[in-house]
Amino acid sequence: MHILDSVDKASLRSDIPDFRAGDTVKVHVNIVEGSRSRIQVFQGIVIGRQGEGVGETFCVRKVSFQVGVERTFPVHSPVIDHIEVVTRGDVRRAKLYFLRDLRGKKAKIKEKRS
């Protein structure tokens, strides 16, 4: 088991900012199309984080053209170029799955005061 722990520790990223559910983030994802690669930005609200260590993931939700889009990213994935925290949200839950049923201003999250 100690060998697996050392391999896991080596593949953890150290450049991940501190973010939690309710925060609005920009995830810069590296997209490879044939021989070309480009960076695509996915901006939305973090609705939850799951797991720990190498297998930790987070789910980001945004509304694009009146259609809700959710995307789950591994936190320590090499596909992620970097994560940028836009705003901090003031929420009382760890999982914000109730946002899936809300529309318009009801789906808005209060900004945390600093």
Curated annotation (Swiss-Prot):
MF term (GO), any: structural constituent of ribosome
Q: Does the keyword Translocase apply?
A: no
Could you provide one GO biological process annotation from this protein's UniProt record? translation
Which UniProt key words apply to this protein? Answer: Ribonucleoprotein, Ribosomal protein
Q: What is any one of the record's Gene Ontology cellular component terms?
A: cytosolic large ribosomal subunit
Any matching Pfam family:
Ribosomal_L19
- The domain of life for this entry's organism is Bacteria
Q: Which InterPro entries does this one have? A: Ribosomal_bL19, Ribosomal_bL19_CS, Ribosomal_bL19_sf, Translation_prot_SH3-like_sf
User: Which residues fall in a coiled-coil region?
Assistant: none
Which HAMAP family did the record assign?
Answer: Ribosomal_bL19
Concerning PANTHER family, the annotation shows: LARGE RIBOSOMAL SUBUNIT PROTEIN BL19M, RIBOSOMAL PROTEIN L19
Family named by the database record: Belongs to the bacterial ribosomal protein bL19 family.
UniProt function note: This protein is located at the 30S-50S ribosomal subunit interface and may play a role in the structure and function of the aminoacyl-tRNA binding site.
* NCBIfam families named among the record's database cross-references: rplS_bact (TIGR01024)
The protein, known as: Large ribosomal subunit protein bL19
What species was this sequence derived from?
Clavibacter michiganensis subsp. michiganensis (strain NCPPB 382)
